[in-house]
């Protein structure tokens, strides 16, 4: 059964991205959220604890989290449960026109809200491409972002 509707496919063709609603079950999302909090050893109910670490930098890589919120966790089963979930696989298969996919891995992200008293977390980021854009023409690539919690239009990792 296709994941992308005709409207989704037309949107993908026009805009270069598509939103797949309910891509994985809620229990997968909840499990991954738990894994992130556990990995960071942070009590999610203690909002001050969200700032427990200073983000790592090129000079100091002793923190498990970057200023952009990248959490240094790559191989946990909860990540793989989402990467390989059938609905995710099907969506990518439809875009690529092939069921033989190579699953790449990235990590999780958790960035606490910016606060004036925590300037190290006020990083507004930059436009980042996971491609070498100096090579012309730029080769085709597809990447997925899975939001684990509700996110307003004013939040998130896209500019």
Task: Indicate residue ranges for each PLM-predicted region.
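A residue-level signal for beta-strand positions that form part of recognition/binding surfaces
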Residues: 17, 100, 141, 157
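A short beta-strand-loop-beta hairpin characteristic of the jelly-roll/cupin
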Residues: 153-159
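Conserved beta-strand segments that form the floor/walls of ligand-binding pockets within enzyme
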Residues: 19, 126, 143, 147, ...
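Short, conserved beta-strand element in jelly-roll/cupin
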Residues: 134-153
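Non-heme Fe(II)-dependent double-stranded beta-helix
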Residues: 1-14, 21-136
């Amino acid at each position: 059964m296709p994941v992308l509707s005709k409207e989704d496919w037309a949107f993908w063709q026009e805009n270069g991205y598509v939103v797949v609603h309910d891509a994985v079950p809620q229990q997968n999302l909840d499990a991954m959220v738990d894994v992130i909090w556990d990995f960071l050893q942070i009590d999610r109910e203690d909002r001050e604890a969200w700032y427990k670490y200073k983000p790592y930098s090129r000079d100091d890589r002793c923190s498990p989290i970057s200023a952009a919120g990248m959490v240094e966790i790559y191989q946990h089963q909860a990540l793989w449960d989402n990467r390989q979930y059938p609905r995710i696989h099907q969506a990518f298969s439809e875009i690529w026109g092939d069921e033989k996919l190579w699953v790449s891995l990235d990590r999780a992200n958790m960035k606490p809200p910016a606060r004036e008293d925590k300037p190290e977390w006020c990083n507004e980021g930059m436009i980042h491409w996971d491609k070498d854009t100096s090579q012309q023409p730029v080769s085709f690539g597809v990447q997925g972002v899975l939001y684990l919690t509700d996110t307003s239009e004013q939040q998130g990792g896209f500019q």
